């Protein structure tokens, strides 16, 4: 006799939902967490470009220039731009044989 025939199969009356007691606090908490997770996931997928662009540029602000003379601000901007321009010239060249 094979192992598959030894396993009990449920009868149709046992296939119903066994969690009829939905007043259980754990079930309520799990339902709320599941719904919130689904809502946040949908919002993330709909607005991911806006969200991550905000974090990327919002967190990359430079140091505060409050109280710094305009000439020093301009010098700092030129240094930052020259550093960016220098990084743009580094490309990896891959040649396939």
From Swiss-Prot:
Regions of this protein lying in the Intravirion compartment: 44-97
Q: Where in the cell is it found?
A: Virion membrane; Host apical cell membrane
**Which superkingdom, per the lineage?**
Viruses
- Which residues are glycosylated according to the annotation? 20
Secreted: present as a keyword of the record? no
GO CC, sorted alphabetically, is: host cell plasma membrane; membrane; virion membrane
How is this protein's activity kept under control? Answer: The M2 protein from most influenza A strains is inhibited by amantadine and rimantadine, resulting in viral uncoating incapacity. Emergence of amantadine-resistant variants is usually rapid.
Tell me where in this chain the PTM Phosphoserine is found: 64, 82, 93
> Which residue(s) hold a covalent lipid per the annotation (S-palmitoyl cysteine)?
50
Q: Which UniProt keywords apply?
A: Disulfide bond, Glycoprotein, Host cell membrane, Host membrane, Host-virus interaction, Hydrogen ion transport, Inhibition of host autophagy by virus, Ion channel, Ion transport, Lipoprotein, Membrane, Palmitate, Phosphoprotein, Signal-anchor, Transmembrane, Transmembrane helix, Transport, Viral ion channel, Virion
Amino acid composition bias (Basic and acidic residues), ranges on this chain: 71-80
Name the HAMAP family for this protein.
INFV_M2
Domain topic, free-text comment: Cytoplasmic tail plays an important role in virion assembly and morphogenesis.
State whether it acts alone or in a complex, and with which partners, per the record: Homotetramer; composed of two disulfide-linked dimers held together by non-covalent interactions. May interact with matrix protein 1.
> What's the protein name?
Matrix protein 2
Source organism per entry reads Influenza A virus (strain A/Memphis/110/1976 H3N2)
